[in-house]
Structure formats: structure tokens, C-alpha cells
Amino acid sequence: MIRPLLIIRPEPGNAETAARARAFELDTRCIPLFEVRPVPWSPPDPAPYVGVLLTSASALRTAGPELARYLHLPAFAVGGTTARLARDAGFHSVVVGESDVTRLMGKIATLGLHRLLHFCGKDVRSFDPYGIVIDRCIVYASEAIEPPETFRSALAEGPVAMVHSPLAAARLAELVEPESRAHIALVAISANAAEAAG
């Protein structure tokens, strides 16, 4: 018997992931444990920056019209979805890092760039900047929400839980009793996310 896939990421990523899973005829349980909300931000002067760093598609979805001030800069995006949304937003030059921010920073370092503006969420994990100055501009918050009753029944099915961030992994670990963890398989987007799951 194939285990159901438990998708806990916030919308719209939850529905997008579910659609891809269903295309492979996988049984899904879509239960977001977070909601992404924009936060007010003051656009910094783009002049000192040689590029923007985008580690999450949520930054592009929530930044709003002020993002237009930075479209002339090259965008460095983690993941294909983030890169696609950067192009859709109007960035003409988009460099994609397919795996994680650490590898992308290594790639950026070879270009000799010295200062980037990082559009990000309130909760961001530290990473090696490879000597590059990174100024963070918080444009969203990923806020935990109470799981519905269907969450407990989904856990009882012994699902394969997908975690798309260390924050999501930590939240899942917080909600699942230690004795129940042996019945849940985990698929993590990165080593950091797997480690955060405990």
C-alpha cells in the first residue's frame, strides 16, 4: 500500500505541490500549517546593490509594487519556481540556484559581486555569505496556524510528510508526539530542513 503524501506548506505552494503529486497519481493530504502574510517594508535605495537575492517565492508574491524599483538589478533565485516568479515580476537577468542558498552564494562569489539586497521572510536561516555583504529586507512573515482536526487523522494514516523549509520541519516536529514519529516518513527539501525535523 502506498502511503498518502502530507503537504504542510502554505498556500499557494500547497495546492501547486498537490497538483504535481496528483499528476503522478499520488494520494495527497493538503493541510497547510502556515499562512504567509505580507509585512510593511520601506524600500531601500537600490543604488548600493549589484543584485537581489531571492530565497523564497513568497518574497515575490508579497513584496508588492515597490519591487519594481529593483528590476534593473540581476536576481539570484533559489529554485525554479522562485526564478520563474522573478521573471514574471520583470527581472530581466535571473540566475538560478537549483539546490540551496549556500551553493547559490558560492556561484555568486565567483562573479565578484560585493553587495546584495535579500528580499526575505521574518524567519530566515543564516548561511555563508562568502564575503558578500547581504542586507536583508523583510517583506513577509510565515505564521503558524492551528491545524484542523483532519491533521490528526492524516497522521494516523502513516503519511509521507513533505517539508519545504526548516521552519515547517520544526513545526511538524512540534505537533507530532515523539512516539508517533516512527510511523511518519519525511521528505525534506534540504539537509537543513531534515535536521530541523529532529
Regions found by a protein language model. Give the residues of each.
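Signature of uroporphyrinogen-III synthase
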Residues: M1-G198
